[in-house]
Amino acid sequence: MEQNGSTVVRAYAKINLSLDVVKKRDDGYHEINSLFQNISLYDRLSIVKIDRGLEIKSNVEIENNILYKVWDLFCEKYKEPEFGFRVILEKNIPMEAGLGGGSADAAALLFFLGKTFKIPTSELLNLAIKIGSDVPFFLIGGTAVVKGKGEKIEPLPALKGYYVDLLTSENGISTKEAYSLLNPSLFNRAPCSPYVLYEAYKNRNAGEIKRCTYNIFEKVVANNYKEIMANIKRLRRTHITAALTGSGSAVFGVSFRDGKYKFVSRGVEYEETKL
């Protein structure tokens, strides 16, 4: 949609159809094994040229916003352009919910800068992992198996015909806090690999989808966040499957027939362009 000559980029939320932690690395990061899926809930970034630098306006608090980190790292690597940008960020993705909103926004700005200055995706991916562990996925988007700390991404053919409902909690969970509560004895406990779960979705096998849905962080929230576990149980009564996404606090339910959101095949994309 054209907004006063701006370029509008959509940044889509993600859910983790499965999420396991393999190990904690010596550098403090955790290695994951997960099936990521973008959904049709999105933030909107309206971007216009200005004389210099990066300005951000938003409907939420923007202090230390990840978009500043994107700009700083981009300018550090490629030198600051002769002109800058104003970003009007319309936040619709709940924060601290495990839906990847901040990472999606970062990828959206990186995507825009890459297109504007003709930088190949391979270079953008190298920059993305320095911004945040989930950012590379959003540059690729859709359906993918994600490993390592988020930098190992295997895109898979898009899953279609699935719908999603979300329930959020009043109290968000910071990723750092959630990982700090993980006990190594919980690592590598997923009942299926992400590939087995993907095939179950591909074949629309409801029983196998339910069996293979897994999120290691449910072991953490079970003892500390009763409201979240209640939300999972609520969605499991009405959907094929339901689980926590990311490290929480949002939970999702998947359906064949209807839902507020649907699976999408992009992490970021232009809504309409006019620069």
UniProtKB/Swiss-Prot annotation:
The active site is at residues 14, 134. One of its GO terms (biological process) is terpenoid biosynthetic process. It holds the Pfam family GHMP_kinases_N. GO terms for molecular function: 4-(cytidine 5'-diphospho)-2-C-methyl-D-erythritol kinase activity; ATP binding. Signal peptide: none annotated. Keywords: ATP-binding, Isoprene biosynthesis, Kinase, Nucleotide-binding, Transferase. ATP binds at residues 94-104. InterPro entries: GHMP_kinase_C_sf, GHMP_kinase_N_dom, IspE, Ribosomal_Su5_D2-typ_SF, Ribsml_uS5_D2-typ_fold_subgr. Catalyzes the phosphorylation of the position 2 hydroxy group of 4-diphosphocytidyl-2C-methyl-D-erythritol. Belongs to the GHMP kinase family. IspE subfamily. This is 4-diphosphocytidyl-2-C-methyl-D-erythritol kinase.
